[in-house]
Amino acid sequence: MTPDETFVELRDGRFKIRVLSAGEGDPVVFLHGAGGLFWDPFLDAIAAGHRVVAPEHPGAGDSQGLEHVEDLWDLVLYYNELLDHLELPRVSLLGHSFGGMVAAEIAATSPERVDKLALIAPIGLWLDEHPIPDISGVPPERIPELVLADPQGPLAALMPAPDPSNPESLFRAAMTMASILQFIWPLPDKGLAKRLYRVKAPTLLVWGGQDRLVDPAYGDAFASAIPGARLEVIDGAGHLPQLEQGERTTAVVTEFLG
């Protein structure tokens, strides 16, 4: 499935945001992680039964407006504006990693606009016994070791990566990473843990059993903090269960979304 690509402008052109969308049915908004926005077979499968809308974070890829977002709260307000602009007053939110953190913040601070909440290996909490590494200092060639259960497997070769011989490609990848990392650190100070009790939407948490970036212990922490949340651990997957164990992850998420 080839998604539609549009650019949305907000605040008199201060934001110019790339949005991918496909499918029909109840809306599901997908918020991507630090690796950037890519349409993959997982989103294809979700779009088979829903209207999937996937906006790119400001400053990532081809999207502009990062300079108008100072902190995480600014980002949450921005996403509420974007949903209003897209005429999506109530949606299901599907977020991966950093996108999961943002989705959880939206569900906690604007519970009336979230129908269901599906979080795949979200960040946002901190456990001293399982510190999350700062990937800004990790060489690109070592990323598969952190995010894949099998860093030598075929998926490692397919992971999107900048062309080391192309300065523009390297710059865009660095900007995408920087546009997201600025909202993450210092992670313990963001305060999500004290807001998760406000989530009212039915919540699904999906975690790779071999996640070396965000330890599966965080799945238990999120499940304990969000009322009624359900945790599904996918064996044989790391931080990208929707890609590494796509069939099982897709089945769990599509069953939850209905």
Where on the chain are the PLM-derived regions?
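Flexible "cap/lid" loop of the alpha/beta hydrolase fold
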Residues: 104-109, 115-146
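Hydrophobic, aromatic-rich cap/lid helix
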Residues: 2-4, 165-194, 198
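Acidic catalytic loop of the alpha/beta-hydrolase fold
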Residues: 210-214
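Active-site loop/oxyanion-hole signature of alpha/beta-hydrolase fold enzymes
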Residues: 12-13, 53-94, 243, 251
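Short beta-strand/loop motif that positions the catalytic acidic residue
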Residues: 199, 205-207
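Catalytic active-site module of serine/aspartate enzymes centered on a nucleophile-bearing elbow/loop
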Residues: 229-258
